[in-house]
UniProtKB/Swiss-Prot annotation:
4-amino-2-methyl-5-(diphosphooxymethyl)pyrimidine binds at Q48, F49, R50, Q51, K52, N84, S123, K153. This is Thiamine-phosphate synthase. It catalyses: 2-[(2R,5Z)-2-carboxy-4-methylthiazol-5(2H)-ylidene]ethyl phosphate + 4-amino-2-methyl-5-(diphosphooxymethyl)pyrimidine + 2 H(+) = thiamine phosphate + CO2 + diphosphate; 2-(2-carboxy-4-methylthiazol-5-yl)ethyl phosphate + 4-amino-2-methyl-5-(diphosphooxymethyl)pyrimidine + 2 H(+) = thiamine phosphate + CO2 + diphosphate; 4-methyl-5-(2-phosphooxyethyl)-thiazole + 4-amino-2-methyl-5-(diphosphooxymethyl)pyrimidine + H(+) = thiamine phosphate + diphosphate. Keywords: Magnesium, Metal-binding, Thiamine biosynthesis, Transferase. One of its GO terms (cellular component) is cytoplasm. Binds 1 Mg(2+) ion per subunit. SUPFAM superfamilies: Thiamin phosphate synthase. GO terms for biological process: thiamine biosynthetic process; thiamine diphosphate biosynthetic process. The gene is thiE.
Length: 219
């Protein structure tokens, strides 16, 4: 079951987001698992498993193994576990949710496969995309961004806080979660529009627990 409160602070990450860690693939995997457990203890409200980018795992077996470990941690703390893009994996692992973008599997197909099993999040980068999908009851929330410049979405045009305002003012009733370049310094600008999703604000933080506390207080 979907509860919009889980959008307050969503941590999004994969092993590739620990590129700053010395060592190889296994060191990045361990860094993800350690950071996820700390984040769960610090009361993030959801975790989204996302393997994308140059250093992302490529072997489906390794991806599944890591996803399972992340899922077990989320279950231990009673926190929703969401899989980004990998619809089949979300179904196989019985993830709580699945999040897809505009370039991933067609949203109608995702709904047909997942609506009885997972809640569904959809990324929107324009007002038109939000208006087009507003009638899809099976879509639980919209992920809106990138709000600020971000290295994880280099090819996407920054949409700014203005897009959140336009979507809300257009009468779209779905919960919104902002993503892209969100930090402890700018998160407060987004409070009135819904939740926030972050990657580097947690993975790159020296004091991760403190960063999460600040993000939760701002969200």
């Amino acid at each position: 079951m979907f509860d919009a409160n889980c959008l307050k602070l969503m941590f999004v990450a994969g092993s590739q987001d620990f590129y700053h860690i010395k060592g190889g693939k296994n060191d990045r995997i361990n860094a993800l698992l350690d950071t996820l457990e700390l984040a769960l203890q610090s009361q993030i409200t959801a975790f989204q498993f996302r393997q994308k980018g140059d250093l992302a795992l490529q072997d489906p077996v390794e991806i599944k193994q890591l996803a399972l470990k992340c899922q077990k941690l989320c279950q231990k703390y009673g926190t929703p576990f969401i899989i980004n893009d990998e619809v089949r994996l979300a179904l196989e692992l019985k993830a709580d949710g699945v999040h897809v973008g505009q370039e991933d599997m067609a949203i109608e197909e995702v709904i047909a496969l997942c609506k009885k099993h997972q809640f569904i999040g959809l990324s929107v980068n324009t007002l038109e995309q939000a208006l087009k999908a507003r009638h899809l009851d099976a879509v639980a929330y919209f992920g809106v961004g990138p709000i600020f410049p971000t290295p994880s979405k280099k090819d996407k045009q920054v949409v700014g806080v203005e897009l959140l305002k336009k979507i809300r003012d257009s009468g779209v009733k779905k919960p919104l979660i902002a993503i892209g370049g969100i930090t402890t310094h700018n998160a407060s600008k987004l409070r009135e529009y819904g939740g926030i999703a972050v990657i580097s604000a947690i993975t790159q933080a020296r004091d991760k627990a403190l960063a999460i506390e600040k993000l939760l207080n701002n969200a």
